[in-house]
Structures are given as structure tokens and as C-alpha cells.
Amino acid sequence: MNIRHFFWALAVAALLPAVAQAGGKGPEWLSKAVFYQIYPSSYMDSNGDGVGDLPGIASRLDYLKQLGVNALWLNPVYESGWFDGGYDIIDFYKVDPRFGNNDDLVRLVDEAHKRGMKVCLDLVAGHSSDKCQWFVESQQGTNGRYSDYYIWSDTIGKKDAADIARRRQAEDPKASTIGHWVEADAPRGKYYYKNYYECQPALNYGYAHPSASRPWEQGVDAPGPQAVRRELRNIMAFWMDKGVDGFRVDMAASLVKGDKDKKATMQLWGEMRRWLDEHYPQNVLISEWSYPQQSILAGFNIDFEIHIGRSAYSSLFFQGDTPWGKTKKIDNCYFNRLGKGSLKDFINIYAADYNATKDRGYIAIPTANHDFQRPNVGTRNSPDQLKVAMTFFLTMPGVPFIYYGDELGMKYQDGIAPKEGSRNRAGSRTPMQWTPGPTAGFSTCAPAQLYFPVATDGGKLTVEAEEKDPGSMLNYVKRLLALRASVPALGNDAGWQLLNTLDGEQYPMVYLRTAASGERCLVALNPSEKAVTLRTGQPAGKVLVSTGKGSYKHGTVKLAPFSAIIVRL
């Protein structure tokens, strides 16, 4: 642990007395959970309109069961203004007509449960659409039910006024994320506070340190912020009473404003977790936070270790010549054919997070998601390379999350025209590829009607083709998931120890997984185009699964380019 992470751990420890602890890691089913994320508009279209829907997802549950996943996370399915891919919600209690209706969601959940699968929804807790009835009524004055559901002001500072002026100069001001205040000139106030786009007014959870000189800053215990908390619980209860098993919370760290150390936000989620444990003990909360030492301490069962804020995930997967590599200014990521990456950034961050949270909750390292590029991007594009990456994703501790299509090796399709706020994220939202053809079996519509076009690999990377090929990516993923389910040392709760020294050889990556029973497995990964060797100092063992060419003899790992092995010691 480097000095920066040491002091961060001390800071977290200092918060322990202030943040009342929620109970344990959560329901028992999490110990064997494997999640599959579905972007509903792009998974399966049941009615030929070119957009995926809930009956379409239900029709593919048997495929998901056979794959080996046992939990689903659906991106937002609520009624939306569709300016930001469903994250601008008009009605939190209603399924958007493009996906079906509330009964369709209940049927999907029921059918999933019959197959032993859980279903979690996306909870967009921080904002609504400006078309939401709460916001429409909030504008009308100071004495209404929803007047303080949002943050209003009649005055703003010079910097905020300058941000508004800059946003006006943008090519599309409504699609600009510059600044936070939006001109409204409504009876309730001249300005409202937005989270991202103008159409996404921030819900008012209060300010951590309100100032009398800024009258719009209400404390977290003020009536408005407390009413918003009750509404959030009502939304959760509404869907959980219909059978939903939990929620992934969008931008969970952002709710309380002016909360630099996140203490007030952590207290909010601790309150939610205690409520959940009391009333819905078999349900879960998953955070988009990417700081597990905060989120899991606050009460979340799972947090993602992704690209937000810190470099752990980015240093592994975002090569410099790919869209997210350019944004993050990373020259050489670890999972790249050149073999010039380093484990240091990932391990320094991940090891600290893992050791601090392993007894409280789970870290998830997803294959990708709707907000960033897939593993198949740039020069990391062959099945051999992608199998090595998938070996990593499916043998690390915590809860695996597979983004739809990554089990096939679907590519991030650069250059797709943006739609509904997708920007360059469109390349990760193309239709699921079921069968060869112009619509990849996703829809019966004409190709021009598709929500997004099929990626250019759609003719060869399909479920139909890969199911028939014993050496396919899909069948390799099935083998990995079956192994994870049957070998306790590879499970969600088993221990983890890196065998590389960070100042020594970086390739291959080698780590141990250890079950409570003492059973141990060694995992070795070589994502580079060079043959590599590492002496591990471990005893003899038996290779359980491999991809590419590799050996394990007398404690020494030898791996050909783009190879991985899993050894039971």
C-alpha cells in the first residue's frame, strides 16, 4: 500500500464512528451471484419496431441460464424523455411504453425467478427529467408538495453566470454539461440546479454544509431533502413489492451536494441499507461509486471498480489509441498485445479496496458497461486476447458482471452516430448478435429501423455460430462460469493474493485464490504477444482450464502469447 492509500485508509477509519454500520455482506445468494447487464433497447426486440423490450428479454432467459449467469441488471426501463438513454426519467413508477408495461416487467421477473435468476433495476436517484410531474409542480411556487424536491435560487454567482453564458455558445446548449445552474424564470425561482444536461434537474438531498449566505442550500434534515429520501424509499418499495431483487444506483456518490468527504452521502446510504435490511433482507444495493472503501462502508453490497475518478480499471484496459484511452491519457494499458503495461496502478488501488472491504461487501470488476468501451476494441480484437481478459474477469474475487455480448467478444463499434445522448458510448450499445444477418436476429425490422446499427462483426460473432464452435469465446465463458460455480477457491468470497512483485516482472499476472476450506487455485494471465515465464514458489498442481498454450511445472508458469491457465494446487 503506498502512502496516499495509507492515509486514505486512515481517513475512512475516522469515519467509522460517524457512519452507523449496516449489516454484513448481504443475502446469501450474493456469494454465488454472477450478473449479466442488459441495455434493454439493444438486447431483443419482440415486436419488430427496431427497439429491444421486456418481452424480448424474457424470451432469452433460457440462453442466459445456459450461459451460467444467475442475476440480471437492467439499465433504466422507466418512462423517459430519452435525452440521455433513459437516465432522464419522467415517471419512476411506470415502465416506458417502448419496453412494454409494468405487467411485462413483473412477468420478466417471475420468469427469471422460475429459473433461479435475480433481477435488479437501475435506480437513477440523483435527478429526474424536467418533464417529470414533480418538477413541473415544483416550478409553481414555494408552498407545493414538490416545491423543495429540487434546488432553486433567484441569484447565482459570477462563475455560475459565466458557465451559463459558455453553455449558450455550445453547438447544442441542451446537450452541454457545462456548469450546474439553468435559467428557468419560474414562479419557484429564476434558476434550478442540474446534474448533467439541462433536462436533468437535481433532486434535493440537501447540502452537507449549508451556508446562510446561500439560501438555496438546505440542510440534509430539512423537510424538502427528507421528503425526497422518503420518495426514494417509496420507489424502491414499489418495485421490490413486485418482485425486483434490488437496484444498481446511478452515480450514488453524488446525492448530497457540497459533500467533499462524502460523509453525509454515506450516512444517507447507511440509512437506506438499514431500511432495506429490515424490510427487504433478501434484496441488494449496488453502487456506481468506484470507491469501495466509501460505498461498501456506507452499506452498499457491491461497488464497481471502474474508470470513474481513479486509474485502477483504466490502467488495465484503456489503451492509448482507443477512445477511452485517449480520454484517460494512458499510453500502454496492461491488457494489450505490446506487453508494456504495469500492474502498479491497479494493484495499489484494488488491493487497498479489497483488503478494507472483503468482509463487508463485494467489489465488481465488470467486463464493460453502457458508459465505456468493450474489451474488443482497437488492437485487442482476437478471440485469443479476449479469452485472456475474460479469464481475469471471471476468476477475480467479488461479483462478476458480464456486459451483454461480451461473452461473444462483440466489438466496440467506433464511429456510430450518437442517439439519445449516447455520444461515443453508442459503440457499446449496438444490438445483441443472435444470428447472422442484417439485424443479427435482434429484430425482424428493416436494418434502417434499428435503434443502433449492428456492429460490423455481426455476421460472424453470433450466438448461433459460437454455440456450434467448441473453441468459441462463448463456450469458453461457459466453461469459466461452470468452473467458478463448482470450485470454491474461485468463488466470490474466496481469498486473493497477487504473486507478482510490483517492482519485478509484470507479465504474466499471477494470483492465488483460497477458499475457506484451504483449497487453492493459481491463475496466470499473459495478455501480451510475448512468451513469458514466472517462478511462483508454489507447489505442484493440476491445470483445470487453459486458453492458448501454457504450462505449470515445479512452481514455474510458462505462457505463450495470449494465454492463460487456471491451476488447482
Model-derived features with residue positions:
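Bacterial N-terminal signal peptides
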Residues: 9-17
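Acidic/aromatic-lined carbohydrate-recognition and catalytic surfaces
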Residues: 23-227, 241, 252-300, 432
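Conserved alpha/beta catalytic core and glycan-binding cleft of carbohydrate-active enzymes
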Residues: 130-131, 135-172, 269, 273-431, ...
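Glycan-recognition and catalytic regions of carbohydrate-active enzymes
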Residues: 453-521
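Asparagine-centered strand-capping/turn motif at beta-strand->loop junctions
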Residues: 524-528
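Beta-strand-rich binding/interaction modules
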Residues: 530-548
